[in-house]
Amino acid sequence: MSRPPLLSSACLAATCSLLLGGCVAAGDVRPYAAMAPIVPVVAPTVQPTAGAIYAAGPGLNLYGDRRARDVGDLLTITLIESTTASSSANTSTSKKDATTMASPTLLGAPLTVAGLDVLQNTLKGDRAFDGKGNTAQSNRMQGSVTVTVIQRLPNGNLVVQGQKNLRLNQGDELVQVQGIVRDADIAPDNTIPSSKVAEARIAYGGRGAIAQSNAMGWLSRFFNSRLSPY
């Protein structure tokens, strides 16, 4: 016995809904790829000259501190970023016009129809515009990232780069820092605040259940795009 067409359509719709629901699981539960091994940056070694007493090298500083100064050294950057921006605009315009056209006269008397002055006109115009806009944004980041010196510039400044990857319950958190620091700005404990990093590039992001919950679905992105007719 064949099933009614309406029942078959309902079963097909229910099956499709279950399949689509399984594709939209909460969080990315796929296994993570293995982390790439960290390759340390090592300063090039200078081969000693045969027969020479002294050879070029990093040297040993007996009385100095242990601050980063050479390629491959480590430096801790303290992230203290706080920005607040706000803007507001208010525009209001209005204009009114009024013009009265007198009725023409014939032999000193206005032309009337049933006692009404039908040729007398009054033109009026009234335009008004009122617009307001407000925007505000606030960002704050605190923490620390240990970076590696990848280049020492001729003026003594250090080009640093590093990242921190935290793998939590259902997601990854990644912090990347790049920039240029001065040797004089490095504290005795080999730290420097992020506010003293030139050409700073600080990126913070993540993926997983928390990051996915903050992202719009494909249908919501369509209705918020320029392609949406509404």
Curated annotation (Swiss-Prot):
Localization of this protein: Cell outer membrane; Bacterial flagellum basal body
Cellular component terms (Gene Ontology): bacterial-type flagellum basal body, distal rod, L ring; cell outer membrane
A single GO molecular function term of this UniProt record: cytoskeletal motor activity
Pfam families noted in UniProt: FlgH
Membrane topology: Lipid-anchor
Covalently lipidated residues, kind S-diacylglycerol cysteine: 16
Alphabetically ordered keywords of this record: Bacterial flagellum, Cell outer membrane, Lipoprotein, Membrane, Palmitate, Signal
Signal peptide: 1-15
Subcellular location, principal: membrane
Residues anchoring lipid (N-palmitoyl cysteine): 16
One GO term (biological process): bacterial-type flagellum-dependent cell motility
Disulphide-bridged cysteine pairs: none
PROSITE patterns: PROKAR_LIPOPROTEIN
Purpose of the protein: Assembles around the rod to form the L-ring and probably protects the motor/basal body from shearing forces during rotation.
UniProt similarity note: Belongs to the FlgH family.
Subunit structure: The basal body constitutes a major portion of the flagellar organelle and consists of four rings (L,P,S, and M) mounted on a central rod.
Name of the protein this chain belongs to: Flagellar L-ring protein
The species this protein was found in: Xanthomonas oryzae pv. oryzae (strain KACC10331 / KXO85)
Biological classification of the source: Bacteria, Pseudomonadati, Pseudomonadota, Gammaproteobacteria, Lysobacterales
